[in-house]
A protein has these predicted regions:
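Preference for long, amphipathic alpha-helical scaffolds in soluble/luminal domains
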Residues: 1-329
């Protein structure tokens, strides 16, 4: 199980927070990143049946209403094809949990826009119909999967196209994935592997097992340079679905003298900011760092991904139900 106590703290700081970071402003993406941790914790725009000390339903409602207002007639929320799938995931999650008909209309239009924007080669990039890159494609695949799980219409052939794209960036020798060409970038490998898992690839698939070895080498408890929240977010989902020793290694840390330590969950908890910095309300957040998209995404993205990563423990059921020899954590 995961220690979840810290998850309550960031939410209360997420909305009123004023950032001292120099991150580029993208209100669409920011709203998506702000909503997702609430939704992943089961908090929607509907008031909770049991009154808690703080009711975040109005905060979630405000974010959803903002996104619906921003959505174009073509279904695009704006902010580019990084922001659109991110927001689509949030809207699909909100609809899936509430069956709100207004959200259904918006979410289906958003899915339809993604289908329109997909390149013939199977991927997505910054503009509609542009030849894909693995990073944007990963968000789009998660959006389609969220829509499918919420009961929205997602044509099955779109996944076949995604497989075509993944094949084009997969390095069979290493088991890794590249950004636009075959490679073994750890972060792109995590994205590619998660997409494959969503496509139903067998957990014993040699390519997946090779990919696990790539991810183990960038475990932040083994390699401090591996502390990249974008990478950790995807890799945690991958390892969670793999289960067994792969998950134990990732979650609890490498084994030494019969014990595991420096697992991802403990590293994330230790890095949560405990106090404000002057006038800036940063308590409960995570520092953006410098790896990957951290500087452009800023503190909000780092905090959102950190929370979503820890919510994997109780939000996602492992895709692979078979026993693979690991501890039950």
């Amino acid at each position: 199980s995961c220690r979840t106590a810290p998850l309550g703290a960031p939410g209360s700081k997420l909305i009123p927070y004023k950032s001292p970071d120099k991150a580029q402003s993208n209100d669409i993406a920011g709203t998506g990143f702000g909503l997702l941790p609430f939704l992943a914790a089961g908090i929607t725009h509907k008031p909770a049946a049991k009154k808690s000390s703080v009711d975040y339903s109005k905060t979630v409602m405000g974010g959803i209403n903002y996104l619906i207002r921003k959505q174009g007639k073509d279904g695009n929320y704006g902010g580019g094809l990084y922001a659109h799938p991110l927001v689509t995931i949030a809207m699909c999650e909100a609809y899936g949990m509430t069956s709100d008909p207004l959200i259904k209309v918006s979410a289906q239009k958003a899915i339809d826009y993604l289908i329109y924007a997909q390149h013939d080669g199977g991927g997505w990039r910054y503009s509609p119909k542009q030849a894909g890159d693995t990073s944007v494609t990963g968000w789009c695949v998660m959006a389609l999967k969220s829509g499918q799980m919420a009961g929205l219409k997602v044509p099955a052939e779109r996944y076949k196209l995604v497989e075509k794209y993944l094949d084009s960036v997969h390095d069979a020798k290493s088991g890794g994935y590249g950004y636009t060409d075959p490679g073994n970038s750890p972060v792109m490998t995590a994205v590619g592997m998660l997409c494959r898992q969503y496509m139903g690839v067998n957990p014993r698939n040699p390519g997946l097992l090779k990919g696990v070895d790539i991810l183990k080498k960038v475990h932040p408890g083994v390699n401090p340079a591996g502390y990249n929240m974008y990478q950790i977010y995807y890799a945690t989902q991958v390892m969670h679905h793999m289960g067994g020793e792969a998950w134990d290694f990732w979650n609890l840390g490498p084994e030494s003298n019969g014990q595991r330590k420096n697992g991802v969950r403990d590293i994330l908890i230790s890095k949560q900011v405990n106090a404000n910095k002057g006038k800036f309300m940063v308590a409960g957040s995570w520092e953006p760092g410098t790896a990957g998209h951290a500087e452009s995404g800023g503190r909000l993205m780092a905090t959102s991904l950190s929370m979503l990563t820890m919510e994997v423990y109780y939000r996602h059921l492992p895709l692979y139900r078979r026993e693979m020899g690991g501890a039950k954590n």
